[in-house]
Amino acid sequence: MIKAMALSSAGVVSHLHPPSFSSSSGLSVNRVLFRNRNASPCGLSLPILNPSRSVLVFARGKNRKGFVSSSSSSPKKNKKKSLDGADNGGGEEEEDPFEALFNLLEEDLKNDNSDDEEISEEELEALADELARALGVGDDVDDIDLFGSVTGDVDVDVDNDDDDNDDDDNDDDDDDSEEDERPTKLKNWQLKRLAYALKAGRRKTSIKNLAAEVCLDRAYVLELLRDPPPKLLMLSATLPDEKPPVAAPENSSPDPSPVESLSAEDVVVEPKEKVKDEAVHVMQQRWSAQKRVKKAHIETLEKVYRRSKRPTNAVVSSIVQVTNLPRKRVLKWFEDKRAEDGVPDKRAPYQAPV
């Protein structure tokens, strides 16, 4: 559109300054633009100009195959595209890369023969030789993998990596490496003890005591019990269902005579007295009878004794209530006090003074 407007403006300028060159049709531009020079310029007629190639390219680029132009594009974007098309007006039409790629694929499919034969063994050997030369391995075809890896090299690399890791671990944990040193061959008594433990089960066996007994590392004993070797399994299957012999302590005396002298007849088992179930009030009375008489209680009893050597039952009940002493204890105290003072048990009849 901008190009067409520019061309139309150029025609108007040519009206003001008419050029002297002639058109391709053999008629002068003056004749085409102004048929009557004496007449007023209101009857202006412009020649029909063919659109330039760049405008056609720009218009065609909008409607290319495989691209859908959005109707909601902003006018600024359209203006920018039109300016780019105007700048590249003199260039040739650029091909779409996707269309060129599809065209190449179609040509390859057309040229491709459907009767291709499978790869023969000779071609495979030739390919293996080329890979060997490229990798610098040699002519050994068995060590070469067609996917680009060499089996021998991979094994060597893996071994080297493992060796490196082992070296690092040994440098970092020297103490662990010393603890992990395991005997190459177990002795018969160690195998027998481990077989008994395997037969009994790990849950019923103290791993710590077992490791100390067989003089092995605890981790190694655990590994043997979790994944026992075939020899240990066979030995465990042949063992009878008996407990292993308990080793005698070193400090024990070899003569077992004192142990045998103790027989069941000599040992006398004293029967335990069965505690009878007693009532609460009986237990309370026994406890109160064992209660110690305090000094304040004695003072109260002495005050009552000064007033009456033989207190009545009401007075005794009040004393029991105040002192929380048992009744028998109170009566016993009064009897002992009368015996100390020499008061007779029976009261003598009253005699009037003469």
UniProtKB/Swiss-Prot annotation:
Subcellular location: Nucleus
Keyword Membrane: no
Name listed for the protein in its UniProt record: Protein OVEREXPRESSOR OF CATIONIC PEROXIDASE 3
SMART domains listed in its UniProt record: HOX (SM00389)
SUPFAM superfamilies assigned: Homeodomain-like
Residues annotated to bind DNA: 286-345
Motif Nuclear localization signal 2 boundaries: 191-198
Acidic residues composition bias: residue spans: 154-181
Intervals of motif Nuclear localization signal 1: 63-70
Organism: Arabidopsis thaliana (Mouse-ear cress)
GO CC entries: nucleus
Pfam families: Homeodomain (PF00046)
Region feature Disordered, mapped onto this chain: 65-98, 151-186, 243-264
Keywords, comma-separated and alphabetical: Abscisic acid signaling pathway, DNA-binding, Homeobox, Jasmonic acid signaling pathway, Nucleus, Oxidoreductase, Peroxidase, Plant defense, Repeat
InterPro entries to which the protein is assigned, alphabetical: HD, Homeodomain-like_sf
Major subcellular site: nucleus
Gene3D superfamilies: Homeodomain-like
Function per UniProt: May modulate chromatin structure by regulation of nucleosome assembly/disassembly. Homeodomain transcription factor that mediates jasmonic acid (JA)-mediated COI1-dependent and abscisic acid (ABA)-mediated PMR4-dependent resistance to infection by necrotrophic fungal pathogens (e.g. B.cinerea and P.cucumerina) and bacterial pathogens (e.g. P.syringae DC3000); this resistance involves at least callose deposition. Required for the P.fluorescens WCS417r-triggered JA-dependent induced systemic resistance (ISR) against both P.syringae DC3000 and H.arabidopsidis.
Induction (UniProt): Constitutively expressed in healthy plants but repressed in response to infection by necrotrophic fungi. Repressed by drought and abscisic acid (ABA).
The keyword Oxidoreductase is annotated on this UniProt entry: yes
The organism's taxonomic lineage, starting at the top: Eukaryota, Viridiplantae, Streptophyta, Embryophyta, Tracheophyta
Renumbered ranges of motif Nuclear localization signal 3: 293-300
Gene: OCP3
GO terms, biological process: abscisic acid-activated signaling pathway; defense response; defense response to bacterium; defense response to fungus; defense response to oomycetes; induced systemic resistance; jasmonic acid mediated signaling pathway; regulation of abscisic acid-activated signaling pathway
GO molecular function, one term: peroxidase activity
